[in-house]
Amino acid sequence: VYITFGVHERRDAATWAQYAEKHFGPEHPLFLGGLSMGATTVLLASALELPPSVRGVIADCGFSSPEAIMRSVLRAHVKWLPAGPLLGLMDVCTRVFAGFSIKEASTLDAVSKTKRPILFIHGTADTFVPCAMSQTAYDVCASEKQLILVDGARHGYSYLVDRPRVQAALAAFLEKYTSQEAIQ
């Protein structure tokens, strides 16, 4: 079993949503949410066929694609090696051992097709997943969207750094889209 940076996990999220709607009923609104790789997973899932009860997506510090995050990490931490050949080797390894390509999925492609509203959250001091990745996803997102940038928050710390602001954004997002009609 391998972690696939959201590529295969997106289908797990969609399957979970279908299971929840089947067992709890379509009248109960569902939201997909995740942090870091979980955020990437739910952003990728947003473009899949989801049940109508999925009313929105909450993504805290998601990355653009497996290739983009690997490139970013290599540039930040392995500066003395060229990223290109290493990414090629990583792609071969992920294809052989985990059954996916690091070039296979992009949150930018997914959010440019989604109908579900998305709340993007990201800390401006994130040195692992660059804040620009959420900004770019927000910019290309085709659905209703909101972007909360938390000054000074490192990777995954937005809620802890500015709890009142993030809580207020979450509450407003959930309230707004819980009461809306199901998305077909």
Regions found by a protein language model. Give the residues of each.
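Short beta-strand/loop motif that positions the catalytic acidic residue
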Residues: 113-115, 120-122, 126
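Alpha/beta-hydrolase active-site loop
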Residues: 2-24
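Short alpha-helix in the alpha/beta-hydrolase fold that links the catalytic acid
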Residues: 107, 116, 130-139
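Catalytic histidine-centered segment of alpha/beta-hydrolase-like enzymes
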Residues: 153-167
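Acidic catalytic loop of the alpha/beta-hydrolase fold
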Residues: 124-129, 156-157
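Catalytic histidine neighborhood in serine/cysteine hydrolases
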Residues: 139-156
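Hydrolase active-site cap/lid region
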Residues: 44-101, 109
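Alpha/beta-hydrolase fold nucleophile elbow
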Residues: 24-36
